[in-house]
């Protein structure tokens, strides 16, 4: 079966590769339709590793996906051939302590698509547990279905924040995940969300959503912008979504006393944190790693029409041009939010 393979750092190829396609009793086989290009996919392409996860052998990329069920296992009663679906890419050990606690996203044994050594799904077909597969409502397109995965991260962040209706939030970093967090925070009850970045094009994209206030920190300090928006009280919630070490310096200057800081962006190296400032304000600190028990909620919110992710899809490529999609993503064009790859017509 032909797939997009990361051979090693900086080298991609479209080639035949043997992938596991045996359908177990609790599995579904899916004809992949749309796959999003994630920042982690690009990082593996450009750097060959993310932390301790190192590409040591050829690996198929892609984990943000939607498609159509073509075969079901003997025990599967909730799906049938022809069902349109999206898939949660992380499958934990269902007997693990983390899973039993409901925090399967931090299960050390989780198997996550396109995370070494596990193959991703930029290929015509994939087999996946039915328990981590979700039907797409009729009004949700394949393109939107492939956006559920990154939006679930935003939903996890909003959930960890414990939003109270009317809260004012700040999102540091206007990348794809930052915008997802802002939209999830608004859907969760925030009255407005300030989102900061140096990139005017990205801020312009975010600003098209009602309730999102862009702050260009190349022109104005975030501290001043938040002070003006909150009568110098500070934001109820601050989401750090950039992963930039410099961003951590101001976090406790923009959060209100008794507020919350939610860390989502993953720095490459350890960063300094102003613990005395956090303690003096009694700030609650939360962290986010992927998501758990929230994929279906993210899908339901998209289906409700309360969150429209379609404007964030800034480029679509045929599977034959998927290397070009990754080359474009690696350039970091400021006008791009989410690129997607279509596998329609591929038959293996």
Curated annotation (Swiss-Prot):
SUPFAM superfamilies tied to this protein: GroES-like, NAD(P)-binding Rossmann-fold domains
CDD domains in UniProt: sorbitol_DH
Catalysed reaction equations from the record: xylitol + NAD(+) = D-xylulose + NADH + H(+)
EC numbers on record: 1.1.1.9
Note describing how the cofactor binds: Binds 1 zinc ion per subunit.
Keywords: Metal-binding, NAD, Oxidoreductase, Zinc
Record carries keyword NAD: yes
PANTHER family: SORBITOL DEHYDROGENASE
Family assignment from sequence similarity: Belongs to the zinc-containing alcohol dehydrogenase family.
GO MF assignments: D-xylulose reductase activity; zinc ion binding
Top-level EC class as recorded in UniProt: oxidoreductase
Cofactor(s) this protein cannot do without: Zn(2+)
Transmembrane regions listed in the UniProt entry: none
Binding residue positions for Zn(2+): 38, 63, 149
The protein's name: Putative D-xylulose reductase
InterPro entries given in the database record: ADH-like_C, ADH-like_N, ADH_Zn_CS, GroES-like_sf, NAD(P)-bd_dom_sf, PKS_ER, SDH-like
């Amino acid at each position: 079966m032909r797939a997009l393979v990361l051979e090693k750092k900086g080298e991609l190829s479209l080639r035949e590769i043997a992938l596991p396609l045996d359908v177990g009793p609790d599995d579904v086989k899916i004809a992949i339709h749309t796959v999003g290009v994630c920042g982690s996919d690009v990082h593996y392409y450009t750097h060959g590793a993310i932390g301790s996860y190192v590409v040591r052998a050829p690996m198929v990329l892609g984990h943000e996906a939607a498609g159509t069920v073509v075969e079901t296992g003997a025990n599967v009663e909730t799906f049938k051939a022809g069902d349109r679906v999206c898939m949660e890419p992380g499958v934990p050990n269902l007997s693990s302590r983390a899973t039993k606690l409901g925090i399967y996203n931090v299960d050390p044994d989780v198997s996550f698509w396109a995370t070494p050594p596990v193959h991703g799904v930029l290929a015509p077909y994939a087999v996946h547990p039915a328990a981590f597969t979700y039907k797409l409502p009729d009004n949700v397109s394949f393109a939107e279905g492939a956006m559920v995965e990154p939006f679930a991260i935003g939903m996890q962040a909003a959930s960890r924040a414990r939003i109270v209706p009317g809260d004012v939030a700040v999102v540091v970093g206007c990348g794809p995940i930052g915008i997802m967090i802002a939209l999830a925070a608004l859907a969760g009850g925030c009255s407005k969300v300030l989102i900061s970045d140096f990139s005017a094009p990205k801020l312009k994209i975010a600003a098209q959503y009602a309730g999102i206030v862009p702050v260009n920190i190349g022109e104005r300090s975030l501290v001043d912008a938040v002070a003006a928006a909150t009568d110098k009280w500070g934001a109820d919630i601050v989401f750090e979504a950039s992963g930039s070490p410099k961003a951590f310096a101001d976090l406790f200057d923009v959060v209100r006393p008794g507020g919350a800081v939610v860390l989502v962006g993953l720095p490459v190296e350890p960063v300094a944190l102003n613990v005395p400032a956090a303690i003096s304000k009694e700030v609650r600190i939360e962290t986010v790693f992927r998501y758990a028990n929230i994929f279906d909620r993210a899908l339901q919110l998209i289906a409700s029409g309360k969150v429209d992710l379609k404007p964030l899809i800034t480029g679509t490529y045929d599977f034959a041009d998927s290397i070009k999609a990754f080359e474009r993503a690696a350039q970091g064009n400021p006008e791009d939010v989410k690129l997607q790859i279509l596998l329609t017509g591929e038959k293996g």
